[in-house]
Amino acid sequence: MLHISGFCRYLCGNFDDEMVYVTRTEHFNAAHKLYNPRWTKEQNDAVFGRCANENWHGHNFELDVTIKGNPDPDTGFVYDVKKLSAIINEHVIEKLDHKNLNLDVDFMAGKMCSIENLVIGIWNQLVPHLPEGVKLHCLKLRETPKIYTEYFGE
């Protein structure tokens, strides 16, 4: 009996050196405020506008997590996307969803809660939990349909 991975190698060639990128999308809702305590209210309002609202504001965030690796010869997967989703949910979504980024999120403590700083913080939450052979390639974090950041760990 011919094993399917052997059959695929026979028909398609060996893909051990092929880099494939896989993206999983997750969502969370969170509130925050952009406000520099060293500045006056007027300066904060001038720089951050409505985002400096003293009563906070919120977003429906969309997070794309892109990993890269070689497809497993037996499964064809770079990594099981259900397992990737579980890692994202445990180490990111549960910490952020329906939270105040300024007050409730440990990895944002002492930082300006901009989308730029948030995407770096999310990266740092995910990297230690990915298995060997799976590399985090890119995070894309959408704050609104018109505003997003991309981070490649650089």
Where are these regions (language model features)?
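Charge-rich, low-complexity N-terminal segments
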Residues: 2-154
